[in-house]
Amino acid sequence: MPLSLACSGLGHACSFLGDHATAAKSVEKGIKIQIDAGIEWWLPLHYVFLSAVCFNSGDLEKARRHTEKALQLSQSNSERWSEGQSFIWLGRILGRSYPSKRDEAEEDILRGIKILEELNSKPFSTLGCLFLGECYLETGEKEKAMENLKGAEVMFQQMGMEYWRDRTRKLMEMI
């Protein structure tokens, strides 16, 4: 299992660097290793990573399918952390793909944030707040966007998560 997570984590990182083809191959390799080993535990996380890779490359339809797979697996395996991540990504993808479904996107992101807060997973619930602010910004709701982004910025600063703090600040500059 550590090898599969290493492959998927590497792919996720490659996606942030803009190398989406390598990213997808690496995450898919991680998924294959995990499936071949017959281990379902943490498999949803691999699909969340693959979803993020597809999202970052602009393939929102594939991102949605992978997130739905992650959500289904996380619920069937009772993996609450992955379920929270899946809801956040599902909402982010929905909001970007269909701005008219902003309410549904908001609901999904908030559901994911709530799950992650219940698990005391502050870095990831804060990421959900960033994505919610991004969703509001993309639908022209500047006040709601700023409220969520300011909260996320403070939390990222407190946790020393400079990359995400800086991304949050860039979004705030757009308001």
Regions found by a protein language model. Name each.
Residues 1-175:
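Helix-coil-helix junctions within alpha-helical repeat/solenoid scaffolds
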